[in-house]
Amino acid sequence: MLVSKSIASRAGLASAVASRSCRPSFTAMPLRAKVLGQQAPISTQAAAELFKPVEGDEPEDVLFNSLYNLRSVELNRPAKYNALNGSMIRKIAPRLLEWERSDMANVIVIKGSGEKAFCAGGDVAALAKQNAEGPEGVKKSVDYFGLEYKLNHLISTYTRPYVAFLDGITMGGGVGLSIHAPFRIATERTVFAMPETKIGFFPDVGASFFLPRMPGQVGPYLGLTSALLKGVQVYYAGIATHYLHSSSLPALESRLAELTPRDYWTIEQRLSVINDTIEEFSTGVPYDENIEIGGKIRLAIDRCFKYDKIDEIIAALKEEAAEGAKGGVQSWAKNTLEELTQRSPTSLHVTLRQMRLGKSWGIAHTFKREHQMAAKFMKSHDFNEGVTALLIDKGANGPAKWKPASLDEIPPGANISEDYFRNDPEVPVLELLNDRSYMQYPYNKFGLPNDYDVKEAIEKGNFTREKLIDHFVETRRGKQGVREAVSDVLDRMAVRSKGTEHVQWKKE
């Protein structure tokens, strides 16, 4: 049984809020005009050709279901932890396009089969074996990433409400199916990571967009270290927008199917009703778990990962790990250093540059750039070596033998990431399924308040600490975890104004 900080019945609250928030607003602009630009969707005929089945595709690796106004996608490879492959993409993308054109599909749910995984990533072992066949195999792998990123971009710009159940392992390709959605639900079984630097690759599937936009240096930290987050920590970090117990997901899905939006509702109103419906099923956050990426650890992450060179990050971590260091995070710093020494040096350099550049990329440009980067990695030593050592041989022949073998082998000032950010003349620029794009997520308000939100509130008004926390609890309508999240931000980033009880943001 989940023991929570606050267990309260929310039935009735959501319906009351929904009735207030869903009054028609005839001046509100629709999603397509307001955020995503002119729509240029792929034709049905072109989609059928692009995603047509190929020999070897499994017939039931994805299951689709319709219940009233809800359409669901169920990844159905539980024995493989629902690892994503081309066969699955060729089923999911055309179905999403079909539902986007349907007036009957009012909410989409994506989930994984079984209790262990939502989606543990892409089937990279198959890609490494394919690459070993030579240029034709490499081309097939590059084409796979093209299909995957087309699907990721479609999800990131989707015009129907999209809800992802991150119930179980959610890594790599599974992150691409979920992270760009307005609703991302973590459970006590969720395990999140972007493990690409472990296998000589880079955080892809739109991580170039998502990670750099996280507060402080949390995104670069997650991308470089492949750090694991579990359960409610995925929610506290802002990767999930909601935290529910896994046992409530079937009932939530049934409840979402019963929602009947009015034709005149804006997308904001539709999303608000879905948000309130999800909140009905919240039973609170575990009472005995502090925020892992918070407090001293979060301050150390921001101190160490703010640099633009890997050797400067390593030096900062060594300083934090030294005996007598004032940060009080010696154990964390030592563990982080150990993790980084095991990663592909090339992957670390590419990923750090990606984190810095990605902040200025639009969502469409992100997937086009990542496609070019993936093409370079398919031809690289480290990807094929890393996947073979870790996932195919499973360590039987020792750890991966990177080239260069270690960070120390890279000469000072050498720019080994440069080539990965140049277009490959043999790889055409990726054509996406529509021309929609944006610079910030258009509906990024359903998760917990973060540093950006708290800073904005402090700068707009005079608040005492408790009044500010109460402000967020009230404006987020009692959302579980708000008090803990805002308190952590204030502990790290705010000070009391001189001579008053009001808080102000620390000078950076």
From Swiss-Prot:
Its EC number is 3.1.2.4. GO terms for biological process: valine catabolic process. InterPro entries: ClpP/crotonase-like_dom_sf (IPR029045), ECH_dom (IPR045004), Enoyl-CoA_hyd/isom_CS (IPR018376), HIBYL-CoA-H (IPR032259). GO terms for cellular component: mitochondrion. It catalyses: 3-hydroxy-2-methylpropanoyl-CoA + H2O = 3-hydroxy-2-methylpropanoate + CoA + H(+). It is found in: Mitochondrion. GO terms for molecular function: 3-hydroxyisobutyryl-CoA hydrolase activity. Component of the mitochondrial ribosome (mitoribosome), a dedicated translation machinery responsible for the synthesis of mitochondrial genome-encoded proteins, including at least some of the essential transmembrane subunits of the mitochondrial respiratory chain. The mitoribosomes are attached to the mitochondrial inner membrane and translation products are cotranslationally integrated into the membrane. mS47 has enzymatic activity in vitro, and is able to catalyze the specific hydrolysis of 3-hydroxyisobutyryl-CoA (HIBYL-CoA). Component of the mitochondrial small ribosomal subunit (mt-SSU). Mature N.crassa 74S mitochondrial ribosomes consist of a small (37S) and a large (54S) subunit. The 37S small subunit contains a 16S ribosomal RNA (16S mt-rRNA) and 32 different proteins. The 54S large subunit contains a 23S rRNA (23S mt-rRNA) and 42 different proteins. mS47 forms a protuberance of the N.crassa mitoribosome and retains a solvent-exposed cavity liekly capable of accommodating a substrate, in accordance with it being an active enzyme as well as an integral constituent of the mitoribosome. This is Small ribosomal subunit protein mS47. It comes from Neurospora crassa (strain ATCC 24698 / 74-OR23-1A / CBS 708.71 / DSM 1257 / FGSC 987).
